[in-house]
Amino acid sequence: MRGILIAIEGVNRVGKSTQAMRLKKALECMDYNAVCIRFPNPDTTTGDLILQVLNKMIEMSSEQLHKLFTKHCSEFVAEIAALLKLNFIVIVDRYIWSGLAYAQADGITIETKNIFKPDYTFFLSSKKPLNEKPLTLQRLFETKEKQETIFTNFTIIMNDVPKNRLCIIPATLNKEIIHTMILTKTIKVFDNNSCLNYIKMYDDKYLNVQELNLFDFEWQKCIEDNNDKEEYDDDDFII
């Protein structure tokens, strides 16, 4: 038995953070253990550095930036693993899908080792931000052309996500409707899959959550190859 990892993805400013926090609060009100992790995370050195680059406060090469984001995601593997062991619903506001979509927009291939594949992904679909910033206030990647390229990359990436692990929601829908859809589906995913012991890594290895020792916390020892993990076959994942 373990918790689940839920990703909320999409281009900039389509309501991801709003929906992620609303989901966390709604789950807590229903007595579920829930936590929301934002990427980039401003409370970490790496996340703060990434945000400074995105806000054009400091400069960094595109390759360095994308590799730094992937490193940033991998920094949370131990924390996410512990939360799953403790039966939390872990909500990530952006995750590896963003890393891939944004890196591909710059023609860069990134390393994805030591990163989980989300159990379920909500993709808020929109080619452009719902509220455009003035040009002088735009972050890196927030030009219309760049966001459209990133959206195209997202659609390609989402096509490779198993359909029983993905919900595509038009970002222009009423916020209450989006929230209800995300909350209802998240609860169903959690309740129907609480018997799972493993979570898939991006390199198709598995972390045995039940074997994780919260005393010494050497999660690397719990990584296993893909050897007949029938209980975690994508076709058997229930929604």
Curated annotation (Swiss-Prot):
Biological process (GO) annotations? dTDP biosynthetic process; dTTP biosynthetic process; dUDP biosynthetic process
EC main group: transferase
Keywords on record: ATP-binding, Kinase, Nucleotide biosynthesis, Nucleotide-binding, Transferase
Q: Which GO terms describe its molecular function?
A: ATP binding; dTMP kinase activity
Q: What is its EC number?
A: 2.7.4.9
Q: What PANTHER family would the database entry show?
A: THYMIDYLATE KINASE, UMP-CMP KINASE 2, MITOCHONDRIAL
Describe its function: Catalyzes the conversion of dTMP to dTDP.
Protein name, as recorded:
Thymidylate kinase
